[in-house]
Amino acid sequence: MRRLNRRKTLSLVKELDAFPKVPDSYVETSASGGTVSLIAFTTMALLTIMEFSVYQDTWMKYEYEVDKDFSSKLRINIDITVAMKCHYVGADVLDLAETMVASADGLAYEPALFDLSPQQREWQRMLQLIQSRLQEEHSLQDVIFKSAFKSASTALPPREDDSSLTPDACRIHGHLYVNKVAGNFHITVGKAIPHPRGHAHLAALVNHDSYNFSHRIDHLSFGELVPGIINPLDGTEKIAVDHNQMFQYFITVVPTKLHTYKISADTHQFSVTERERIINHAAGSHGVSGIFMKYDLSSLMVTVTEEHMPFWQFFVRLCGIIGGIFSTTGMLHGIGKFIVEIICCRFRLGSYKPVRSVPFADGHTDNHLPLLENNTH
């Protein structure tokens, strides 16, 4: 009884077979079929390789939301070289919310040479070239995000020539922590001194002819310092043509959470608008000579996440490629073979001959049958 049930079950399963096997003796091969098969297999191989390269690649997904974090501090990373002696200039941040000077203890003043060495100049040209390409090809920013922490350092390389030359500039570098509100980071003549109504700079002790706010921004970023990330002002160099010259940078900072397969960091992107003018009170151009970076924070936060195609999606796409090519090439081969048979095979010379009367021994004739080779019925 069990054997009978097993046979019935096996017979039922065989009837449900959606892939019946055709014996080889009933299969007819042809040169056209072999050619189409070679084309199909080649196409499948090429598309499979291309699909695998897509599977290996990653892309950046951007999501936007309102920034709800107002209690934390904003970090400003600075590395600027000014073409003046260190005891002539002072740098600080004016917080517009509290109208007070933020602590500048994190900044270091280091005597330096303003002119770059040949190796440093080559580094600067390369950085400026990357900046120009980023202006044209915005998708390169995704490549920079994915290569963070594994690419070469973007810091200015040390000098390789004689370092015994007398320093003629001041390198101001370090970081500051400020409130997450609009502010003004500036470098001007004289050291900053706080007082109840704000702050002031001791500029009276500096000779006016010593003013030279030519500067080079080797690095300026907001948030966590992420090696390998190139910021909009990195590599910028400005040469002052007058002692009373003001350089202004209007910066909009966008909080950014970066999540890749290499790092996870809270950083900030920013856009900048530059302006420079000569201070001339007689002509109505008022102001203070110096370098002013006025920044404001966006209310939106951007989350940048590196994503990868899941394996199940890759498998489904691969099956679609293989099955689609098999079905399409088989259908095209069948249509082509059918057309060729209609045009050529139905009208081959010698396959059929005109119908003629065929006499038989009993005296009747047959006018409907073709005449075969031996004139036999």
Curated annotation (Swiss-Prot):
Q: Which cysteines does the record link by disulfide bonds?
A: none
A GO CC annotation recorded here is:
endoplasmic reticulum membrane
UniProt GO BP: endoplasmic reticulum to Golgi vesicle-mediated transport; retrograde vesicle-mediated transport, Golgi to endoplasmic reticulum
* Cytoplasmic topological segments: 1-33, 341-377
Presence of keyword Aminoacyl-tRNA synthetase: no
**Subcellular localization, as worded in the UniProt entry:** Endoplasmic reticulum-Golgi intermediate compartment membrane; Golgi apparatus, cis-Golgi network membrane; Endoplasmic reticulum membrane; Cytoplasm
Q: Please give the residue ranges for the topological domain Lumenal.
A: 55-319
Q: What is this protein's function? A: Possible role in transport between endoplasmic reticulum and Golgi.
- Quaternary state and interactors: May form a heteromeric complex composed of ERGIC1, ERGIC2 and ERGIC3. Interacts with ERGIC3, the interaction is required for the stable expression of both proteins. May interact with EEF1A1.
Query: What is the name of this protein?
Result: Endoplasmic reticulum-Golgi intermediate compartment protein 2
Organism of derivation: Mus musculus (Mouse)
The coding gene here is Ergic2
